[in-house]
Amino acid sequence: MNLLPSNPHGNGLLYAGFNQDHGCFACGMENGFRVYNTDPLKEKEKQEFLEGGVGYVEMLFRCNYLALVGGGKKPKYPPNKVMIWDDLKKKTVIEIEFSTEVKAVKLRRDRIVVVLDSMIKVFTFTHNPHQLHVFETCYNPKGLCVLCPNSNNSLLAFPGAHTGHVQIVDLASTEKPPVDIPAHEGILSCIALNLQGTRIATASEKGTLIRIFDTSSGHLIQELRRGSQAANIYCINFNEDASLICVSSDHGTVHIFAAEDPKRNKQSSLASASFLPKYFSSKWSFSKFQVPSGSPCVCAFGTEPNSVIAICADGSYYKFQFNPKGECTRDVYAQFLEMTDDKL
């Protein structure tokens, strides 16, 4: 969740995002960065800089390396540089400079992937990074890109050259032709891979439909309806076994869908009437909850079964529990920016 150029809540939060397995989340601040354990909520790291904002933070699971990009009113680093921070040494150990602003960074144990506004560059994760690949994209100001963290699957997915298309490449064998998925008619707003790299979920700027595709064939597996009104989708995430997805939007809601068992999702009683528009056969979320503040948020599934975490731009943390019927209750509320260190 990128809150640049300015967070309306005035709390210094510039960026919030989960690590690869959603076990932690990192925050870029006007004066440094912080790392939290997601569930249960604990502040694990707080790095303050006397002068300097961090507009983007990418973790690599729970290891000591993080990718940082400067941002905010007084950026700590130039916005056209990727800095790899070693949290054991408390300093940057790798620096990669570009001719244009860095939009996003993705990490694997063996790769650094840097997203620019119309191309993606892939480097070795070594002390002197070596450029391996360059992929052209359509104009991509949000820096959309997902990298499979699974050691047996090196998939990289990003917006293709055509509007609404997703391109999937295998970094382990780039001679193979990429999988091109015409996911939406409009501009993409969000993409997400499951942990295994077998499924990709997509949304367009219209934000009414979420589509799930098989990454190897590009075939559509499910089409899910978030709502009938347009919405800005902030986040899509799968749970660990990819049986569920959660979706957050600017309507202040988090929706939960069954990704593998479509019968769990709600459907109109008129769904089987062939003369009615496709809308009536839509599969809707089986559970949803309202973020009380209505603040922009990112969401992921918690460590407990049937739990979802929402991390909000106003500094609030919510944990919700839901049951198979879709009934939802708020379990935990906290202000994560006001917490103190817990290194245990």
Swiss-Prot record:
Family from the record: Belongs to the WD repeat PROPPIN family.
Entry keyword tRNA-binding: no
Pfam families: PROPPIN
Top-level lineage group: Eukaryota
SUPFAM superfamilies the UniProt entry points to: WD40 repeat-like
GO MF annotation terms: phosphatidylinositol-3,5-bisphosphate binding; phosphatidylinositol-3-phosphate binding
InterPro entries: PROPPIN, WD40/YVTN_repeat-like_dom_sf, WD40_repeat_dom_sf, WD40_rpt
Function, as annotated: Component of the autophagy machinery that controls the major intracellular degradation process by which cytoplasmic materials are packaged into autophagosomes and delivered to lysosomes for degradation. Binds phosphatidylinositol 3-phosphate (PtdIns3P), and other phosphoinositides including PtdIns(3,5)P2, forming on membranes of the endoplasmic reticulum upon activation of the upstream ULK1 and PI3 kinases and is recruited at phagophore assembly sites where it regulates the elongation of nascent phagophores downstream of WIPI2.
Gene field: wdr45b
Chief subcellular location: other
Domain notes: The L/FRRG motif is required for recruitment to PtdIns3P.
Keywords per UniProt: Autophagy, Lipid-binding, Lysosome, Repeat, WD repeat
Motif L/FRRG motif in this chain: 224-227
Subcellular location: Preautophagosomal structure; Lysosome
One GO cellular component term: lysosome
Gene3D superfamilies hit by this protein: YVTN repeat-like/Quinoprotein amine dehydrogenase (2.130.10.10)
Residue ranges of the TM segments: none
Name this polypeptide is given: WD repeat domain phosphoinositide-interacting protein 3
GO biological process terms held by the UniProt record: autophagosome assembly; cellular response to starvation
WD repeat ranges per the UniProt record: 183-223, 228-267
